Swiss-Prot record:
Gene for this chain: mhpB1
UniProt-recorded Gene Ontology molecular function terms: 3-carboxyethylcatechol 2,3-dioxygenase activity; ferrous iron binding
Active site (UniProt): 115, 179
Pathway(s) it belongs to: Aromatic compound metabolism; 3-phenylpropanoate degradation
Entry function: Catalyzes the non-heme iron(II)-dependent oxidative cleavage of 2,3-dihydroxyphenylpropionic acid and 2,3-dihydroxicinnamic acid into 2-hydroxy-6-ketononadienedioate and 2-hydroxy-6-ketononatrienedioate, respectively.
Species of the source: Dechloromonas aromatica (strain RCB)
Assembly behavior: Homotetramer.
Cofactor: Fe(2+)
Any one Gene Ontology BP term: 3-phenylpropionate catabolic process
Protein name in the entry: 2,3-dihydroxyphenylpropionate/2,3-dihydroxicinnamic acid 1,2-dioxygenase 1
Documented EC number(s): 1.13.11.16
Length: 312
């Protein structure tokens, strides 16, 4: 049993609304190095903790956590479409273990996933199908949210399960860091928006294009005076990464959801995927972790970070 971890920000605006060439080159180099490390590790299983952005999960039934035994990418923005190579039998075994660990997790036998899951998988492996994968989606954009303590405990259960496997396992956490894209809230939404948030599966190409155009338009003004959304918060991002790197996972239990939203943006809660990933890593034993990269990138509406960890 050998376990490695990569936690990365994702951004659908990468390649669509890029910052300066020097910053793009920095990120490309960091991702190329991370991908080479994954290839050298040659995982026999990837467990990916990811959010959804109202592409697969909606308020008609919004689980805090869901594990997929089969998953297809919707191909939003510039991501690949098609099925992921989900290990169905192992996913079911993991789901049972999580439930036996007193963590209520939903199970999907036909889950649609978006860039929140697939972009990092593509960046790290070049494919949706190269390695067996188990996707675990953590609600990070559709309030109300459960406490971060529950996310940590989910990660611990996953980590205890994979520690029993005689496999090379890569844990991916994808999301955050500080950011607030134009994701609508159900509270106060008009009828059309509310209907989409409740049951907006399989939108028309025109609807998806219009939605993506709004995100692009926001990226073009994000961080400027005319943008009313919460700006990026590099200090918050750095403190969060440092906490995980130092292994102080118990501190996330005190995280206040509203305070995080106000300080770093409503979609910052995608860092729940990082919390779960590091909790899974810690459950397998002591680890060494380091920060590979960080830069606040307004054009991508993201505090963009990359962190890696391996067993001691």
């Amino acid at each position: 049993m050998t376990i490695q971890l990569k936690c990365l920000s994702h951004t659908p605006l990468r390649g669509i609304n890029d910052p300066g060439a020097a910053t793009v080159a920095e990120v490309d180099a960091v991702l190329a190095k991370a991908k080479a490390e994954v290839e050298a590790f040659d995982p026999e299983l990837i467990v990916v903790f990811a959010p959804d952005h109202y592409n697969g999960l909606f308020y008609d039934l919004m689980p805090p956590f869901v594990i997929a035994t089969a998953a297809d990418s919707v191909g939003d923005y510039q991501t690949m479409t098609g099925p992921l190579s989900v290990d169905k039998d192992l996913a079911l075994e993991m789901a049972k273990f999580i439930l036996d660990s007193d963590i209520d997790i939903a199970i999907s036998h036909r889950l649609q996933v978006d860039h929140g899951c697939t972009q990092t998988l593509e960046e790290m492996t070049g494919s949706l199908t190269r390695y067996p994968v188990i996707p675990i989606i953590i609600n990070s954009v559709a309030p109300p949210f459960g406490p971060y303590r529950r996310v940590r405990k989910l990660g611990e259960a996953v980590g205890k399960f994979i520690a029993k496997l005689n496999k090379r396992v890569l844990i991916l956490g994808t999301g955050g860091l500080s950011h607030e894209p134009p994701v609508p809230l159900l509270s106060g939404a008009n009828e059309d928006i509310a209907n989409f948030l409740i049951a907006g599966r399989n939108p028309t190409p025109e609807f998806r294009a219009a939605r993506q155009a709004r995100t692009l338009a926001t990226g073009m003004i994000f961080g400027k005076p005319e943008c009313e959304l919460t700006p990026l918060n590099p200090e918050w991002d750095q403190n969060f990464m440092d906490l995980l790197i130092r292994g102080q996972l118990d501190k996330v239990d005190a995280f206040d959801i509203e305070e995080i939203s106000k300080a770093a943006g409503r979609s910052t809660h995608e860092v729940r995927t990082w919390v779960a990933a590091f909790a899974a890593m810690a459950a397998s034993g002591p680890y060494n972790a380091h920060q590979d990269y960080y830069r606040p990138i307004n054009e991508w509406i993201a505090g963009y970070g990359v962190v890696s960890a391996s067993q001691k």
